[in-house]
Amino acid sequence: MSAVLTAEQALKLVGEMFVYHMPFNRALGMELERYEKEFAQLAFKNQPMMVGNWAQSILHGGVIASALDVAAGLVCVGSTLTRHETISEDELRQRLSRMGTIDLRVDYLRPGRGERFTATSSLLRAGNKVAVARVELHNEEQLYIASATATYMVG
């Protein structure tokens, strides 16, 4: 029998799993700065392996999309798994294993120039089966780099 988690503990565990336990996300160096049921903010620093255009030294579009996807996933999954006051860790992990991205629509608004990037997401809607989030990516100068709408299977 697994531990019973409060909604707050469940949200903390989801954040740790998404950002610090997934090898790809760790490789990107993501840091979770703020995480609530319907809002998430994560940041990462530009690294040589993230450059998609070496002549301009800008982020690869896949890195941008990945950061947006993770930020959106946090609010879609977190809001779903914390609807009740408590959840067992086993149930959380089992339900999480069935959740995933259905669609991610990215608008690349500016070249990904900068040293540090911040992705912020907010929940638009959470149903029993599907959740939708809106995400933005800014650099350290607060230039708007990209936005996305993400749809997740959550039930």
UniProtKB/Swiss-Prot annotation:
Disruption phenotype: The yigI-tesB-fadM triple knockout mutant shows severely limited, but not completely halted, growth on CLA. PANTHER family: 1,4-DIHYDROXY-2-NAPHTHOYL-COA THIOESTERASE 1, MEDIUM_LONG-CHAIN ACYL-COA THIOESTERASE YIGI. CDD domains: PaaI_thioesterase. It comes from the Bacteria. This is Medium/long-chain acyl-CoA thioesterase YigI. It holds the Pfam family 4HBT. Displays thioesterase activity against medium- to long-chain acyl-CoA substrates. Is involved in the thioesterase-dependent beta-oxidation pathway of (9Z,11E)-octadecadienoate (conjugated linoleic acid or CLA), along with TesB and FadM. In vitro, is active against decanoyl-CoA and palmitoyl-CoA (hexadecanoyl-CoA), but not with acetyl-, butyl- or benzoyl-CoA. Lacks general lipase or amidase activity. Likely plays an important and specific role under natural conditions in permitting the metabolism of unusual carbon sources. Its EC number is 3.1.2.20. SUPFAM superfamilies: Thioesterase/thiol ester dehydrase-isomerase (SSF54637). Keywords: Cytoplasm, Hydrolase, Lipid metabolism. GO terms for biological process: lipid metabolic process; monocarboxylic acid metabolic process. The keyword Aminoacyl-tRNA synthetase does not apply. It is found in: Cytoplasm. One of its GO terms (molecular function) is acyl-CoA hydrolase activity. Belongs to the YigI thioesterase family. It is an enzyme of class 3 (hydrolase). Induction: Induced by acidic environment, high oxygen availability and exposure to aminoglycosides. It comes from Escherichia coli (strain K12). One of its GO terms (cellular component) is cytosol.
